[in-house]
Amino acid sequence: MLYNPLEQFTVNKIISLYTVYYSMSLTNSSLYFIIAAIISFFIFKYSANIPYVSLINKNNYSILTESLYKTILKMVKEQIGDKYTIYMPLIFSLFIIILVSNLVGLIPYGFSPTALFALPLGLSVTIIISVTVIGFVKYHLKYFSVLLPSGTPLGLVPLLLVVELLSYIARAFSLGIRLAANITSGHILLNIISGFLFKTSGIALLFVIIPFTLFIALTGLELIVAILQAYVWSILTCIYIKDSLILH
């Protein structure tokens, strides 16, 4: 039992390999991310065949996968427009890998890779750099007009330029911090409640029922948060891509 709520986020080495020139380790965070990647691979593999799945052969898994695929497809179409086919594989991949990474952390003694700020921040910075490159390749220097709204008075140009630049850079951090903070806070709360349940297991039944009910409710809430955060990440990525394709 973990008595320190933050102990669950400790990165521990499972296997270490040392050579003369470098060292390589498999940590618990890496292991669970590999598990999430393997699960995501099978979801991708099945999703690729969705248009060819027979109505007769459908089961609960196929219905769930198809629902996820069509939900993301609809969102990408609405946000990006005519060029949605180019970016649909990227957005769906991000949605699934983040969703599965969030969910594996709900397994008892599991580890959520997205609870570590390094992974979400690395992904978010990569996304912002990529959409900036997309916009720069399409519009060249004109792309930087996104930092200066049209009709801005000349006297406000320096101030607005700094504000818009900071706002643009903040996207790279807010996207990752939002995900990591939500997953981390939920796991900490669940750990505190489960620790309280463990300590009160020998007391009167009334003192166990209330925390246990709260624990079940919070677990359900965490499940919803895991799905919503993956969806929010996907829709924000679509918005950033759209902004790089269409200058306002």
Curated annotation (Swiss-Prot):
- GO CC terms for this protein? mitochondrial inner membrane; proton-transporting ATP synthase complex
Q: Where in the cell is it found?
A: Mitochondrion inner membrane
Q: Which domain of life is it from?
A: Eukaryota
MF terms per GO, please? proton-transporting ATP synthase activity, rotational mechanism
Q: Gene3D superfamilies from the entry?
A: ATP synthase, F0 complex, subunit A
**Spans through the membrane:** 24-44, 86-106, 117-137, 146-166, 183-203, 205-225, 227-247
Please name the InterPro entries in this protein's record.
ATP_synth_F0_asu, ATP_synth_F0_asu_AS, ATP_synth_F0_asu_bact/mt, F0_ATP_A_sf
Q: Which PROSITE patterns does this chain map to?
A: ATPASE_A
Q: Provide the family line.
A: Belongs to the ATPase A chain family.
Summarizing the function annotation, the protein's role is:
Mitochondrial membrane ATP synthase (F(1)F(0) ATP synthase or Complex V) produces ATP from ADP in the presence of a proton gradient across the membrane which is generated by electron transport complexes of the respiratory chain. F-type ATPases consist of two structural domains, F(1) - containing the extramembraneous catalytic core and F(0) - containing the membrane proton channel, linked together by a central stalk and a peripheral stalk. During catalysis, ATP synthesis in the catalytic domain of F(1) is coupled via a rotary mechanism of the central stalk subunits to proton translocation.
For this entry, the protein name equals ATP synthase subunit a
Q: Which organism is it from?
A: Zancudomyces culisetae (Gut fungus)
